[in-house]
Amino acid sequence: MKSTEYRVQSTDQISLGQPRKRSVSETVCQQSGLSGEAGLPAIIGITGGIGSGKSTIARELVKRGFAVYDCDKEAKRIIAENKDVQQQIINLFGEKSFVNGVYNTQYISKCVFSPSLQGRSGEALLAQLNAIIHPAVGLDIMKRQPDFVESAILFESGLNLLCHRISVIDAPEDIRIARTIARDYHGDASPANINKVRARIHAQHIPQGDLTLLNDGHTPIPELVDEILAVY
């Protein structure tokens, strides 16, 4: 897989319906010394909404010996280890961002989901936080050169621009709700919990990838992974 190379896409080629912002790929290229025209190792993106089963697909790929980069897990590691990232977060949110060197998730969540902090909206703060973390994750991806990158927010983070191809994992809403209830609520399928999960599902928008796989439980996971590998 590593013999294939591609060129980082420019966001000028992608219409997002919003003013053009500096992409993760551009930031990564600048920090790594690469140009936007540099050949880079082929990376396959794996994405999908909550309860779609993308993590199950990723685990099967790992079992087969592929290097899979879990963006959520690695972002937490980067925050815990990267002093530059830590300082940027402290500059944004203040000294309470870390307690005895440990990332203060509760405090940060309160900041980004509160109406305002020092005159800045929670939405603006979240965007600034993402602007710190996502490029750091992108740079780490290029250093590690995995075969696959798994992320629920692959497109929102801009990390899709580092991927050669993207597989989207999907499932019917009722199955996604059941899976998420079992995972996040210990199987407590109360109306309140179901409504929370449904709201999370409806809040997500997963753009179309190069390959969409229906993970509804009828096709064994190994066969779905075979489909991904057959295409790429």
At which residue positions do the language-model features occur?
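Extreme N-terminal, non-catalytic leader segments
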Residues: 2, 6-41
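Hydrophobic anchor at the beta1->P-loop junction of P-loop NTPases
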Residues: 46
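ATP-binding Walker
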Residues: 52
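Walker A/P-loop
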Residues: 55
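ATP-dependent small-molecule kinase phosphotransfer cores
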Residues: 73-146
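Small-molecule kinase domains that catalyze NTP-dependent phosphoryl transfer to phosphate-bearing small molecules
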Residues: 137-141, 161-162, 173, 182-232
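ATP-dependent NMP and nucleoside kinases share a basic, alpha-helical "lid"
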Residues: 140-142, 149-181
